[in-house]
């Protein structure tokens, strides 16, 4: 699915709720503004996709909830690749396809997702350790020393892989906002200098992803930042 959230698209979306939304419900976020360009117009609340089982019943419930939320005035949708072992992103992708059939365009919706936690794939039925070795270690996407706390990585090759997987799961070619997910997970595992080096390398990759059009903005999703 082409394109991304745009100022024109999000304003068109907000205009549908001109008489029903509370004053100030839609606004221009400073953090998603580029000098000289109009900012997107986003709802004051969004819908997240964190909890639930990675099964078809939950998939359908999430898809229906996202469609209902967007039809009700919410145009910010958040996820992460590890949420429900990639199924939350896929449920968003299904919702986007359904909404397109209902006349709601991709450029009206602001999508954010995250990468950093190493996650299995709910669509894979084999051993998770074998999956990890096949998908990440053997191809050289991850080295053992890249992994912190047994669950987290933010090396450029890993983030590139995760972003590409997220784009496929979502069925889009650009994510509006991409977060490094809880990078502080690594703070107690590696020296501070090494942590900062890893974070700089992650940002360098994310800058390249902006340049190639795979993401629009990036940042950190952190509890302890």
Task: Please describe what each predicted stretch is.
Residues 1-131, 205, 211:
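N-terminal binding-site loop/beta-alpha segment at the start of enzyme catalytic domains
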Residues 135-225:
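Glycine/proline-rich, positively charged
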């Amino acid at each position: 699915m082409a394109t991304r959230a745009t100022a024109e698209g999000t304003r068109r979306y907000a205009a549908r709720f001109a008489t029903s939304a509370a004053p100030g419900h839609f606004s221009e976020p400073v953090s998603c503004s580029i000098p000289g360009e109009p900012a997107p117009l986003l709802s004051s609340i969004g819908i997240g996709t964190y909890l639930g089982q990675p099964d078809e019943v939950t998939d359908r419930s999430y898809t229906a909830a996202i469609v209902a939320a967007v039809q009700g005035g919410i145009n910010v949708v958040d996820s992460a690749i590890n949420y429900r072992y990639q199924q939350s992103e896929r449920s968003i992708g299904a919702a986007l396809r359904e909404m397109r059939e209902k006349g709601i365009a991709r450029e009206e919706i602001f999508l954010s997702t995250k990468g950093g936690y190493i996650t299995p794939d709910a669509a894979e039925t084999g051993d998770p350790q074998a999956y990890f070795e096949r998908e990440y270690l053997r191809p050289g996407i991850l080295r053992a020393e890249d992994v912190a706390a047994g669950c987290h990585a933010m090396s450029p090759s890993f983030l590139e892989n995760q972003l590409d997987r997220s784009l496929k799961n979502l069925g889009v070619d650009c994510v509006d906002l991409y977060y490094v997910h809880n990078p502080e997970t690594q703070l107690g595992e590696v020296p501070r200098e090494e942590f900062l080096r890893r974070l700089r390398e992650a940002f360098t990759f994310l800058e390249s992803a902006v340049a190639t059009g795979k993401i629009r903005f990036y940042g950190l999703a952190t509890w302890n930042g």
